[in-house]
Amino acid sequence: PGPRGTKTAEKKREAIVEDYFHADSKEKFNQDTDTLLYLAARNQHIEKKLKPAIFKKKIIICDRFIDSTLAYQVYGKGVNKSLVDSVHKYILGNIKPDLTFILKVNISKALQRLKNRKRKNRYDRFSKNFYVKVQNAFLKIARKNQNRYFVLDNSKDSNVIEKTIL
């Protein structure tokens, strides 16, 4: 989770997801601070990676973007939507994705895969209910703008999904 692509964005992401936020940590950010760190990392990614690529008229593919912040922070964790919307509006300007692919997953299977991961971060430890809320949020976002979103069944072979996207 979280924006990547620049050293600064990576450092912010690591601050959010890595070990000192585990259950035994004495230092925890509140939800707004957590979200603002994600948004700061996203801004860095936009300024240093996306805007230069857009200027050069390159095709851009992002692993996660603004919909992830809405799904995870707003719908999953209950962060104030107007806060996220305001910051997104400020940092994005007129930038918006042309297409978004959402991979619909079987939550139980996804949780099993997370359980088997060798290196975990705090997002790997959230409840099934959290992931149900996040997936429902992605699907809700997709329903609102069906021209931009494509929901794909992630239970299919990854080669089939790749061919569908391409």
Briefly describe each language-model feature range.
Residues 62-64, 93-114:
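Conserved phosphate-donor/acceptor-positioning beta-strand/loop module used by diverse small-molecule
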Residues 1, 102, 151-153:
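Structural signal for conserved beta-strand scaffold positions within catalytic alpha/beta enzyme cores
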Residues 57, 97, 146-149:
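A generic structural signal for alpha->beta connector loops
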Residues 2-92:
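ATP-dependent small-molecule kinase phosphotransfer cores
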Residues 7-14, 105, 109, 133:
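Generic alpha-helical secondary structure signal
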Residues 108-166:
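NTP-dependent small-molecule kinase module
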Residues 37, 83-86, 99, 130, ...:
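Residue-level recognition of specific faces of alpha-helices
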Residues 3, 41, 65, 105-106, ...:
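Short beta->alpha linker loops
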